[in-house]
Amino acid sequence: MNLKNLLPAAASLLIISCNDNTKGVTTETTFKWPEGVAAPTTEKKPHEMVAHGDVRVDNYYWMNDFFKKGPDSTKVVDYLKAENAYVDTMMSAAKGFRKNLYDELKGRIKEKDESVPYKDNGYWYYTRVEEGKNYAVYCRKKETLDAPEEIIHNANQVGEGKPYYSVAGLEVSDNNEMVAIGEDEVSRRLYKLRFKNLKTGEYSPETISNTEGGSYAWAADNKTVFYIIKDLTTLLGFQVWRHEVGTDPKNDVKVYEEKDNRHYIGVGRTKSKKYVIITSELSEQQSEHRFLDASDPKGEFKVFHPRTMGLVYDIDHYNDKFYVRTNLDATNFRLMETPLDKTSKEYWKEVIPNRKDVYLAGFTLFKDHMVVSELKEGLMNLRVIDQKDKSEHYLQFDEPAYLSSVGVNADFNTTTLRFNYQSMVTPGSVYDYNMDTKTKELKKQNEVVGGYDKSDYVTERAFATSRDGKRVPVSIVYKKGTQKDGSHPLLLYAYGSYGSTSYATFNSNRLSLLNRGFVYVLAHIRGGQEMGREWYDDGKMMNKKNTFNDFIDCAEFLIREKYTSKGHVYAMGGSAGGLLMGAVTNMRPDLWNGVVAQVPYVDVITTMSDPGIPLTTGEYLEWGNPANKEEYFYMKSYSPYDNVEAKAYPNILITTGLHDSQVQYFEPAKWVAKMREMKTDKNIILFKTNMEAGHGGASGRFKALEDVALIYAFLFSLEGITS
C-alpha cells in the first residue's frame, strides 16, 4: 500500500481567511531603505574555462568550495552569513511588518486538521496535524472509521527539534503488518530507510542509508522490499536492491543497475499489486520498464520493451493485459494494450488515439471503469470510460481556470472515483464521484478560518500573443473591485521547464497579496506542457529562449490590458523558474520593478559541463550538452550568470538553501556577487540563504511561512505598502 499520496494536512489542506479592508495601491513609495549600508563584497579569483575555443573567466568559481571542503570553505560560509545579515539590515524597517505578515499567514492555517480518509486493503488511511505542531501524524483505522486509531508514524516525535525533517515513502506491506519509512534529516534528499512493525510498534534493527525517498516496493511475501540506492556524488538513483526485513543490509542483493547516468530510475507496484516495476527514464525522451511477479521476489525482472531513443511509455496492469500510455507515433500520447506475455511494441493495440489538441496525461484503472486525465489548453479534464460497454463522459466544471485531478484511488473494485478540485478562488476540495450514476459528493473543502467568500475574488483566463504568434494562456486572480486602470501592482509567476504543467490552484498565502491590491497571474509559458507535448518541445534545448520571450510577452500583454503598468510589475519563479527570472532580468531589466528568484538555476554552462554535479547528466536533453559546440553557444547566449552586464538591474530578492541538492548554493551566490560588481543602478539586491535547508526550503508548515513573509514584505516595501 502506497502512502506517499497521504499528504500532510499542512500541505494538502490549505485554508485561508480574509479581511474586509482591501488596501489601496500606493504609487508613491513611503518605505525607506536604510541609507549608508554597504552591500557585502567578496574577493575575486579568476578561474579560466575553455571550450570550443571560447574562454570564460569566472571570478567567483571558488565559492564551490563548501561541499568540497576546500581552502575557501570557511570564506563561503562567512560570505553567506554576511549576505543574510545584510538582508536583516535592509529589511529592518519592515521587521514589524514581516512579523505581522507571518502571524497573518499562520492565522489562516487550521492548526488542528485532518485529511479525507481513503480505504485500501481493509484499512482507512488519513493524516492529521495537531495544534502547534509542524509535522503530520500518519494514521489508519481497520475496516470502519469508528475503529480505534492506529498511528503509523508520528513525524513530530522524530522531527521536532531537528533543523530539517522530511518523510517520503510510507509503504505498507500487503498483510498490513509492516511499514517502510524514508526519512531525510539534512535536506539533501538522501533518505534513510527504516522498517516498523505496526503490530508491536517496534522498529527492525537495520537502517539503509542513501536511498531514493518514496521509491520503495514490497513483494507479496511481506518481508521483501525493493529500494533504490543513490550515487553520493551525482545524487542520482542508480541501483535497485532487494532487502529482507530483519536481516543485515550487507546481505542485500542488487537486482538492477542503471549504466547510463543520464537516466532517472524508480521502483513501485502496479495498482493491481500483481507486479513490481522498475522504471528508467531519460528526460521525457526515452523510457524502459522491467516487471516482476510480486509473488516471486527472487525471480528475474523482465524487460517490457527495450529502451529506444524517442520512445516514451508507462504501464499498468489490468486483468489479462497491460495498458501502455505511449508517444509511439503519437506526439500527444495515446493509450494501447498488450497481452501479459507479449509486451514488445509490435503487440501493442490502440485503445485511445493521439489527438492534436489534447495531451493524454495519465490513466487510472478500476474493475469496470477507466479514468483518463486529459490536458487541453492548460486545463485538466477527467474522462470516464465504462469498460463494459465503452460508453464515456467527462466531468463538468464551470470556472474559467481550475485544476481537476484524480485523487487517491487505492480500491480497484469500486465504482467511486475520488477526485480533487480547486481553482484560484476555490479552496482545495475532495469529491467522491459515482461513475455509474454520474453523481458527486463533496467530502471536504479546505476550511476557511474566519470566513471566506469566494465571490469577493475574481478569477479569469486570457491569452497573450507571443512575438511568434503563439497563444499563451494566463490565469489571473484579483480582489473584486480592482479596477483595470493600470494602477495596481501585479506579480507574474511561471516555471516553464521539464514539461511540468503549472495549474491554476488555490493558495491561502496569496490572499495577503490580493487583499493589498496586487493582481496575481500565472503564465503558462512554453517549456511546460499546458498546450500539449509540442508546447514542451518548443521550450527546451535549442528552443529555450521561447520560454523567456513568452514570459516577457505576457507581461507586456498584461500592461496593455491595464491589469498593471510599467513600474508596478513583479516577476517570480523558482529553480528552473529561477533561471527564467535570471534570463528575463538580463533581457528586459526595465520591465520589472522587482524580481524574486527562489533557488535559481543560473550558471547553466558551468553546471552542465560538470557531470559530478548532482543531476547534470540526466538533463542533457533538457538544456543541452556543452560538449556539443552548437548547444554550448546557445546555452551561453541565455545563461543568466554569463550574461550579467554593466547596466541597470531591478530590485531583486534571491533565496537559496545551503544544502540544496538540485541547484547548488554557489550558483545564486556567484550570480549575486557578479551582479553587485557590474550593475550601474542604486536598486537593491538581497540574498537570503537558509543555512539548514535544501531545494524545498524549510521543513515544517510554520517555518516555511517565514520565507513567504520575507518575500511579501520585499514586494510590499517596493510598492510603499507598509501594513
Language-model features: locations:
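Sec-dependent signal peptide recognition
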Residues: 2-9
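Beta-propeller folds
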Residues: 9, 18-416, 420, 424-428, ...
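Glycine-rich His-Gly loop
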Residues: 129, 327, 422, 493-497, ...
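C-terminal substrate/ligand-recognition segments
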Residues: 326-328, 361-377, 464-473, 499, ...
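Active-site-proximal cap/loop segments of hydrolase catalytic domains
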Residues: 522-723
